[in-house]
Amino acid sequence: MRQPNSLHQTEDGPKLIAIPAGWFLMGSEDGQDNERPVHRVWVDDFWLAECQVTNAEYAKFVRATGAEAPPLFNDPNFNHPQQPVVAICWFEAVRYCEWLSGLHGGSYRLPTEVEWERAARGGVAGKLFPWGDAPPESLPDYAKRWRNGPEMAGCADPNGFGLRDLCANVHEWCSDWFQGDYYGSSPERNPRGPETG
């Protein structure tokens, strides 16, 4: 394993950043019911892509496998090569990871919810966002900001781990099933989500 915050990149593959193992507080007392209770969780080290998957990266998968192109690939507000790919289902995201694994000889997969939250927090403890407790400056103009589609992948400042866009732009998929009360019964170390959902 490389040192935390180090980069790893294969030819034609995503830039990966090492997220160090550690404890953190997961959840939000001010959030939705399924984000409570806040609880202490240990996560082993793992790698995560520095930025969201771009249309250009996903297009390589579509061409190589014959997979169906996402419906917004033809929409000029969503089809710039450097915008993050949108409108793909969970199964398509999993197939993309499997394709990357075969292409680069690794074990690419979607992160678990606990891995995603640890990565998104960027090592900042006790704050609502990686930059502190204040809402994003763009919040008042949220609808206007994304009226013409998402911003280019990687345009946000990096968080404490060197990752970009995890708390802005578009949503990401996690590997876990959903269960509304899972936080109340999840294991303390490396929770993988409920068995079904």
Residue locations for each model-derived region?
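A short glycine-rich, aromatic-capped structural motif
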Residues: 8-71, 88-91, 167-168, 175
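Functional-site microenvironments in short loops/helix caps that host divalent-cation chemistry
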Residues: 19, 25, 29-30, 68, ...
